[in-house]
Amino acid sequence: MHVFEREVNGHRYRIAAQSVWDATRGRSVARQAVLGPAAPPPVADLGTTRTVGTRAVGDVGALVWVAEQLDLVGQLDRVCGNVGAQGGPSVGELVVAVAIQRACAPGAKRKLAEFLNSSVARVSCLPSAVFTGQAFHRVAQQVTDRQLEQAQVAIAKAAVARFELATDVLAFDTTNFDTHIATVTPGKLARRGHAKSKRRDLRVVGLGVLVSETGHVPLLYRTYAGNGSDQGVLQACLEGLRELHEALDDGEGRSTPAQRTLVRDGGFWSPQLELELDVVGYHSLISLPLGHSAAEQALQMAARRGAMKALSGKLRHVRAARMRAAVGTVDRTLVVVESQELLQGQKRGIAVALRKAKTELRKLERLTQAGRLARGSLERRVQQALAREHLASFVVTTIGGTAKAPTFRWRVDAGRRRHLERTRLGRRVLCTDRQLWSTGRIVHAFRGQWNVEELFRRAKKGGLVPWGPSYQWADGSLRLHTFATVLGLALVSLAKTVLGTEASARPLMQSLAGIRATLVRTTTGGTGRRPTVMLAPELTAEQRRAVKVFELDRWFPTLLSCMTARPLQS
């Protein structure tokens, strides 16, 4: 969006101009909106000046700047074609507006116009009143899955080219969100499933996200049914992964295809998936399930004296062991890595599970002694009591007697428990086809999985860009709402990348949100309506830097006056 000044009837005004693609005409069309007078603020009596509100500048302006660098509105409009209300906002304008709302002031879409009115920076030159929830939901029913996937690939290509993101290692993971449903319209996305929030009264929508190695920037996502499998969603993304692979090469200006690696956890293990990833051009790095035969072999190797060795550099506090073995029909490098944080978490989990199991085992012991439990029922309930947290490996049970009069004894074997902690707990088995990578590089790449987990924390309830609470009842609305949320996450991540700050995303957005214009109404002594003037705040060093980087002064030129050095007193 371009901001300039124009004289009208002897008065100068600041004008915002925007170019939007019109699919019907097959060309771009121009829009303009008046931002306000360009004249300097009037001289006024402070005793008669009153504040009448504030307007957002920093957070909205920063995300609008990032969206303009990627040409998000144009990218979406070109992919989706002539989608949008007649004379109203296009699909690109609606989605970008909702994405910025989710990141700056999460709320219902019926409050979208109010949110846009509360900001000095503008997403569109159209009046805020045309950005309604009804317009969003109508557009959502016209956009297809394929169009959203094409838009994701185009946006990822633009992000890599503009912000020079590292994409040699990409991390993939899934989560789910619960949503309210009150409609008789059949849908495929919101299903009964195991919600991460532990709520059973709501339906679940799944989300799989592919994240860049640097910046926590989501490059590709997929919405899927809440009762779907993790492997299924990754397999459904294979075509998108292939297109993304080619688009990233173009964005980085490579003459030869890059060697990219896809990182994921053990829930995505599948021999067939390993082969399919190789076909679409990706190397693989995965944390094998510990019950896998190759993982068992690697753990036995790592349990030998002197097998676990400390790594160098930033990973000098990490110990790992390495071997090469056949995993199914393919040759892979296995790395057993030790994590004290994981070990402590598993020990806490075992302590809680063991306490519950002891209560159940004592109850079974009493029922058996009273002759109120058959052997088959006893065996089944003992198996259920010891099913979690490796309890069956160190809680020794003995069931004897007859089918109708069984006997039951149990004990906790401290030696077996110590052996479990020494050889299995706190350890992951990493499996990769990157045979030439060093052990440190493999461990560092797998730690990139944290990028996805951090992104999910930002999208959960109470997070920076929350997905819910959601009342998007139809599948189309759920898809486009999720797209806007992921886009909001990407805008925040890119804004943090541009500033290069060490602070986390939440303090960064809070600092940007502190750049607000205070509206004051004053009396000049002349005739006519009392003028309303925007006053700039006192800025910190970080906020002054953000004003320059994100060009916030184009929306609020008076911000520059806050950045001038104070005169020295003689």
Predicted regions and their residues:
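Conserved glycine(s) in the ABC-transporter nucleotide-binding domain "signature"
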Residues: M1-E93
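Anion-binding and metal-coordination hotspots
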Residues: V3, H11-R14, S28, D77-S570
